[in-house]
Amino acid sequence: MANETVLYDYWRSSASYRVRIALNLCGEAYRSVPVDLLAKAHRAPEHLARNPQGLVPVLDIDGERLTQSLAIIEYLAETRDGTGLLPAHPIDRQRVRALSYAVAMDIHPVCNLGVVARVMAGAGDGEAARREWMQKFIGEGLAAFERMLDHPATGAFCHGDRPTMADLCLVPQVYNARRWDVDLAACPLLVAIDRRCAGIDAFQRAHPDRAKP
């Protein structure tokens, strides 16, 4: 169908995970088309035709093709009423964006598949190098995020008392932190927020364990 909403994603991709949560929170029905990053399906001509960057996610929605997870989430916030993904007031939106960018632009890029593969290739023990790399950069990034949460606007969630784009960025990063055994003992605020999000159906349905083909 021409107007069908289709998400091209990879089950373990943080960026894809963010968009799955956003679509669920918006009540947007969609069909998932897996793009296997480990099999390099994102570099196949078919996927490069969808996204010249060769990245996931790609979202077909409203007759358009969208890329870049935060741009997609902002589009949903602007076109779907009542999502709350971005607050109404400019200063509140700025804070939500700052928190989101702290994950998506500072932690995520140095921990993505291509960067880590290069790290492993240059190490004697690739697996040990990968684990050390992930623990260092995810750990340092989330420690900074925890400090950002020490703010009057933090509520039950990253900003206020309902999930915003910031929570959609945080939760996949905490998932990755646990995957790589990052010590989160010094991050009680973000751990508590992640726990609250885990109780919400939209987050549960987006979890990698549910999205895995």
From Swiss-Prot:
Transmembrane segments: none
GO BP term, pick one: L-phenylalanine catabolic process
Single GO MF descriptor: maleylacetoacetate isomerase activity
Stretches assigned to the GST N-terminal domain: 3-84
PROSITE patterns assigned to the protein according to its UniProt record, in alphabetical order: GST_CTER, GST_NTER
EC numbers, comma separated: 5.2.1.2
InterPro entries (UniProt xref): Glutathione-S-Trfase_C-like, Glutathione-S-Trfase_C_sf, Glutathione_S-Trfase, Glutathione_S-Trfase_N, GST_Zeta, GST_Zeta_C, GST_Zeta_N, Thioredoxin-like_sf
Pathway terms, separated by semicolons: Amino-acid degradation; L-phenylalanine degradation; acetoacetate and fumarate from L-phenylalanine: step 5/6
GO cellular component term of the entry, any: cytoplasm
Keywords attached to this entry: Isomerase, Phenylalanine catabolism, Tyrosine catabolism
SUPFAM superfamilies: GST C-terminal domain-like, Thioredoxin-like
Pfam family, one: GST_C_2
EC top class, as a word: isomerase
Catalytic activity: 4-maleylacetoacetate = 4-fumarylacetoacetate
Ranges where the GST C-terminal domain occurs: 89-213
UniProt family annotation: Belongs to the GST superfamily. Zeta family.
Entry protein name: Maleylacetoacetate isomerase
Native species: Rhizobium meliloti (strain 1021)
Encoding gene, per UniProt annotation: maiA
